[in-house]
Regions:
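Conserved donor NDP-sugar-binding/catalytic core segment of glycosyltransferases
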Residues: 95-127, 131
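N-proximal low-complexity "stem/linker" segments adjacent to membrane-targeting elements
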Residues: 1-25
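Short aromatic/hydrophobic "clamp" motif used to bind/position activated sugar donors
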Residues: 83
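Glycine-rich, basic loop-to-helix element that forms the pyrophosphate-binding segment
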Residues: 62-78, 99
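A structural helix-start
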Residues: 9-17, 37, 41, 93-94
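A recurrent flexible, glycine/aromatic-enriched loop bordering the glycosyltransferase active site
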Residues: 118, 141-159
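The conserved acidic donor/metal-binding loop of glycosyltransferases
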Residues: 87-91
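Acidic donor-binding segment of Leloir-type glycosyltransferases
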Residues: 20-61
């Protein structure tokens, strides 16, 4: 297994549906998807069941402990060579995993990430907030467009 995609979830079944749909459109398929429900009162279990035949999925539930501990839980249950940690509101563009695979074949690295991009359905206010959170003037550094911190860390490419 090349990639373990870990998704911590708290009361977000609609977002998980959109994320899983984007994962079904990936051309690179050597991945497992690990969804960890972090004490949700509104679970995504039925959404996950809808994708059982389309993706290699594992679904876990646990008591609420926050996103960090939930990501760690997913990592402990992963089998992939690389961990990709996504929030439930992410939607991956087609070719995301293939682009990662191509880059890792070209040049080794220890970690990578990607800037946030506003969803087309966001309101003007949501888009303005997104811009302010990812603008070079407000965040600088990696999120602001720095090309490389050192030899083994690459800036956020897209998320």
């Amino acid at each position: 297994m090349k990639y373990s995609i870990i998704i911590p979830v708290y009361n977000r079944p609609e977002e998980v549906n959109e994320l899983l749909q984007s994962l079904t459109k990936q051309t690179y398929r050597d991945m497992e998807v690990i969804i960890v429900e972090d004490g949700s009162t509104v679970t995504c279990e039925s959404v996950v069941r809808n994708y059982a035949g389309k993706l290699q999925l594992r679904y876990y539930t646990k008591e609420n402990s926050g996103p960090g501990m939930t990501r760690n839980f997913g990592a402990e249950h992963s089998q992939g060579d690389f961990l990709i940690i996504l929030d439930s509101d992410c939607v991956l563009p087609e070719g995301f995993l293939q682009a990662i695979e191509d880059e890792l074949m070209r040049k080794d690295c220890d970690a990578w990430g990607g800037p946030d991009r506003a969803h087309d359905g966001f309101s003007s206010v949501q888009k303005a907030i997104n811009y302010s959170m990812t603008s070079f003037l407000t965040t600088g550094g990696i999120r602001g467009g720095k090309k490389q911190m050192d030899k083994k860390f690459y800036p956020r490419s897209f998320n």
